[in-house]
């Protein structure tokens, strides 16, 4: 039509069509495609790309790359949910759970009929007499036919009991004399006792014996009477004459019985010469000058230890002095320690004993006692033992102390902040069968006495003391008849004025608690083994209809259990 009119045609322009987008839509579409496929970081192939940000939906958002937590941290959060809210990790590790541990089980021969009989006492052979303070005589005996704790082993009496089939019939027991006394087994050789286990002497150099009761928490008191020692009479050199020497104090399981109490870092002692306190073989003045300890004096010893729950917090590195109190009586705590006793019955002459690997000295405390000038270990560091020390063996127990009385008069508090004794502060001797980190229930501070060349002493674990300490009041409504000093007479009983762990009690009460604990632990072990056997009793010796079932153990095939041989 334009050509017919003779007018020139207008410049060509693209026209819109339904199938072809407008010129402005083409670059927009391409821009959208470029945004979809443009990398977020420019590369050398397209350095000038500038993507236009646009809103993205939840599905289009790229996944955030978070650092993966370690397995140890995830397990820690699973066990302790409170850590998930921490801004920074807890620098103090958690106390490991010991609930998975059970006592080791051994293959044993069947018990003999004599094993079901009560434990036999030691044999007493008369040795000599010692003049008593009242003008009489004290008969001393040499004990025999019993085992001695040595070579890193600890022995306790046991008996076969048909009520404990899953434990292969053996459980703990006590031999005469019953009650708290100086232990015949836990003593050095060449010591002489009376038949009650309360008097002790020797004709050799320093020897030590521990009592048969361990103090683990609370306040306890006991007494030592010097029956043979330093006298007031002067010799030719102006020094007091001596019939021998006596030391007394508290000792842990690791303390050597072939040395006096206070010899190493595992015991705290007092010597009769000058009334000095002794720790790590370093005597220091304590009693007033010229005071000393003489024949006839009664030395009272009081010890206080915090609750076991607080002690475990100290050993786990979780102790906070601003929150944790040393006299926590544990009344609201429902958790109890898992006592694991790895022990095997052995025969010694006519006796049956449980043999256990005893706790052994540690390098850290030996370095503390004898620091090396060239050593860079913890003993030479500027950090003294304290509850939060980096080395568990050098951690101390808050609010712990030892007080000393002389003839009923408080002389002072020579020792505070006693070293911790629960694992991992105490470790067994490294050998086959020893497992670290376990508490066998025998750790603690034991009353201990050392004698030297004729020195003699008598112990009194209560409840009827020669000089009752403050805090004990006479209870007129509770009189009992007891034998004291060889005479039968009504004996006074004492009630204690303070509640909780700060109540002072005689060591004799702790002995009763220890017996109850041993019975409970025996029952727990029996139930534990019974559950391991599928909640049924298995005849391991092939004597019954279930002899074909052996569970986790098989009959040993031996005719006799292990026989122990020791030199007398």
Swiss-Prot record:
GO cellular component, one term: chromosome, telomeric region
Source species, domain of life: Eukaryota
Biased composition (Basic and acidic residues): 68-77, 89-98
SUPFAM superfamilies documented for this protein: Concanavalin A-like lectins/glucanases
B30.2/SPRY domain span: 160-353
CDD domains: SPRY_Ash2
Gene3D superfamilies per record: 2.60.120.920
Mutant phenotype after disruption: Impairs tri- and dimethylation of H3K4. Impairs mycelial growth, sporulation and spore germination. Impairs fungal virulence but not infection-related morphogenesis. Leads to increased production of several secondary metabolites, including colletochlorins, higginsianins and sclerosporide.
Biological process per Gene Ontology, one example term: negative regulation of gene expression, epigenetic
Keywords per UniProt: Chromosome, Nucleus, Telomere
Entry's Gene Ontology molecular function annotations: transcription cis-regulatory region binding
Principal location listed in the UniProt entry: nucleus
Cell compartments where the protein resides: Nucleus; Chromosome, Telomere
Presence of keyword rRNA-binding: no
Region listing for Disordered, in residue ranges: 1-113
Job of this protein: Component of the COMPASS (Set1C) complex that specifically mono-, di- and trimethylates histone H3 to form H3K4me1/2/3, which subsequently plays a role in telomere length maintenance and transcription elongation regulation. Controls the production of several secondary metabolites, including colletochlorins, higginsianins and sclerosporide. Plays a key role in mycelial growth, sporulation, spore germination and virulence.
Quaternary structure note: Component of the COMPASS complex.
Family stated for the protein in its record: Belongs to the cclA family.
Name of the protein: COMPASS component cclA
Organism of provenance: Colletotrichum higginsianum (strain IMI 349063)
Gene symbol of the encoding locus: cclA
């Amino acid at each position: 039509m334009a050509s017919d009119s003779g007018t020139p045609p207008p410049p060509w322009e693209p026209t819109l069509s339904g199938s072809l987008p407008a010129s402005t839509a083409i670059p927009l579409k391409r821009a959208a495609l470029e945004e979809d496929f443009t990398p977020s970081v420019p590369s050398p192939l397209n350095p000038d790309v500038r993507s236009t940000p646009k809103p993205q939906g939840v599905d289009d958002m790229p996944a955030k790359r978070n650092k993966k937590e370690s397995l140890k941290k995830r397990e820690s959060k699973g066990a302790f949910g409170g850590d998930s809210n921490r801004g920074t990790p807890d620098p103090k590790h958690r106390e490991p759970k010991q609930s998975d541990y059970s006592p080791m089980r051994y293959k044993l021969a069947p018990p003999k009929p004599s094993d079901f009989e009560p434990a036999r006492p030691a044999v007493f052979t008369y040795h000599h007499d010692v003049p008593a303070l009242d003008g009489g005589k004290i008969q001393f005996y040499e004990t025999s036919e019993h085992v001695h704790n040595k070579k890193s082993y600890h022995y306790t009496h046991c008996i076969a009991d048909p009520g404990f089939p899953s434990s292969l019939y053996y459980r703990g027991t006590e031999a005469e004399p019953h009650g708290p006394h100086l232990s015949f087994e836990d003593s050095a050789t060449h010591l002489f006792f009376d038949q009650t286990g309360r008097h002790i002497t020797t004709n050799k150099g320093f020897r030590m014996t521990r009592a048969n009761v361990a103090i683990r928490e609370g306040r306890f008191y006991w007494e030592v009477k010097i029956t043979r020692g330093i006298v007031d009479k002067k010799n030719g050199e102006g020094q007091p004459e001596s019939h021998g020497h006596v030391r007394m104090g508290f000792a842990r399981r690791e303390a050597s019985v072939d040395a006096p109490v206070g010899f190493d870092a595992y015991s705290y002692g007092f010597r009769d010469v000058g009334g000095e306190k002794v720790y790590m073989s370093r005597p220091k003045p304590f009693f007033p000058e010229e005071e000393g300890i003489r024949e006839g004096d009664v030395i009272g010893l009081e010890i206080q230890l915090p609750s076991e729950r607080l002690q475990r917090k100290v050993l786990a590195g979780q102790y906070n002095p601003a929150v944790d109190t040393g006299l926590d009586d544990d009344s609201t705590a429902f958790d109890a320690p898992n006592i694991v006793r790895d022990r095997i019955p052995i025969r010694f002459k006519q006796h049956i004993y449980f043999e256990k690997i005893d706790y052994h000295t540690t390098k850290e405390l030996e370095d503390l006692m004898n620091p090396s000038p060239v050593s860079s270990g913890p003993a030479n560091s500027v950090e003294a033992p304290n509850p939060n020390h980096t080395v568990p063996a050098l951690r101390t127990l808050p609010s712990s102390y030892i007080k000393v009385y002389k003839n009923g008069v408080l002389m002072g508090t020579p020792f505070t902040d006693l070293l911790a004794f629960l694992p991992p502060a105490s470790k067994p001797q490294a050998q086959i069968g020893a497992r670290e980190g376990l508490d066998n229930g025998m750790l603690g501070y034991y009353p201990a006495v050392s004698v030297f060349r004729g020195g003699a002493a008598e112990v009194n674990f209560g409840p009827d003391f020669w000089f009752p300490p403050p805090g004990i009041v006479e209870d007129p409504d509770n009189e009992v008849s007891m034998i004291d000093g060889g005479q039968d007479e009504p004996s006074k009983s004492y009630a204690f004025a303070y509640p909780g762990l700060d109540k002072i009690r005689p060591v004799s009460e702790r002995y009763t608690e220890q017996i109850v604990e041993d019975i409970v632990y025996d029952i727990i072990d029996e139930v534990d083994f019974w559950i391991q056997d599928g909640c049924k009793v298995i005849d391991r010796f092939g004597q019954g209809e279930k002899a074909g079932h052996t569970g986790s153990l098989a009959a040993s095939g031996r005719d006799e259990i292990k026989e122990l041989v020791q030199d007398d």
